[in-house]
Each structure stands twice: as structure tokens, then as C-alpha cells.
Curated annotation (Swiss-Prot):
GO cellular component, one term: cytosol
HAMAP family listed in its UniProt record: PanD
Cofactor detail note: Binds 1 pyruvoyl group covalently per subunit.
Function: Catalyzes the pyruvoyl-dependent decarboxylation of aspartate to produce beta-alanine.
Active site positions: S25 (schiff-base intermediate with substrate), Y58 (proton donor)
Record text on subunit structure and interactions: Heterooctamer of four alpha and four beta subunits.
Sequence positions that bind substrate: T57, G73, S74, A75
Name under which the protein is recorded: Aspartate 1-decarboxylase
Pathway noted in the entry: Cofactor biosynthesis; (R)-pantothenate biosynthesis; beta-alanine from L-aspartate: step 1/1
Length: 128
């Protein structure tokens, strides 16, 4: 059996560009792509923390070290500059890989879209 699992997440990225007339996609700083284990043309889901919008597109490379998160084409209508988004990708993982210790790559970034930390799990949520 295979399970559809969270593979990669870039948490609380600030949108730096919205390019309505650019070919559709989301340009992501290459440093962030690599840290999250994402590759060019990979399908990504984007969840806008500010307005609740959720949509899918694909990743393209943004200038390395720039902090770029550019929503292009119709995706540019889903956010405003400065909105915080979560960028995620999923993968089909078989039971053997899961039992062997497969983990997602979670990347946490600061206000300038620079990496401030990594994790390989989402902590258990509690009421405290």
C-alpha cells in the first residue's frame, strides 16, 4: 500500500511578487527549493494564511538568495504582496519506506524569507 504523505513544506513565506502576465507558476528562491527538497516543475499547493485561499501550481526557480516568492499568472490573483503563505508538496510513499524512517522536509523562514530552521516532523498539537 502507498500513502499520500507531506513531502516538503516552506512555512510562512512572504509573497514578494505577483506577476499576472507572467507564464503561470510560483518562482521560489533556489535556496528554499533545495532546503525543502523541491525541484523545478514539481506540483505545489499554496495556502494563503491571510485570506484562506488554497490553490495548486508548479514551482520554478527564483533567484538564489533573493527570498523570492513570486505568484505568477492566475495565481497572482490569489494573494497580495506581503501575504504569508505555506508552500507544500506531497508524495506517494510505500509502507516499507515509511517503516524505514521516511520523513518530510519542513523549512521555516524569517520575515525576509531566509531559512531560520528545519524539521522533519510536525509536533503533536495540544490544548496548552
Amino acid at each position: 500500500m502507498q500513502r499520500h504523505m507531506l513531502k516538503s513544506k516552506i512555512h510562512r513565506a512572504a509573497v514578494t511578487h505577483c506577476e499576472l502576465h507572467y507564464e503561470g507558476s510560483c518562482a521560489i528562491d533556489e535556496d528554499l527549493l533545495e532546503a525543502a527538497g523541491l525541484i523545478e516543475n514539481e506540483r505545489i499547493d499554496i495556502w494563503n494564511i491571510n485570506n484562506g485561499e488554497r490553490f495548486s501550481t508548479y514551482a520554478i526557480k527564483g533567484e538564489r538568495g533573493s527570498g523570492m516568492i513570486s505568484l505568477n499568472g492566475s495565481a497572482a490573483r490569489r494573494a497580495q504582496l506581503g501575504d504569508l503563505v505555506i508552500i507544500a508538496a506531497f508524495a506517494m510513499v510505500d509502507e516499507a519506506e515509511l517503516q524505514a524512517g521516511w520523513k518530510p522536509k519542513l523549512v521555516f523562514i524569517d520575515e525576509g524569507n531566509k531559512i531560520k530552521g528545519h524539521r522533519d516532523h510536525v509536533p503533536t498539537q495540544s490544548w496548552t
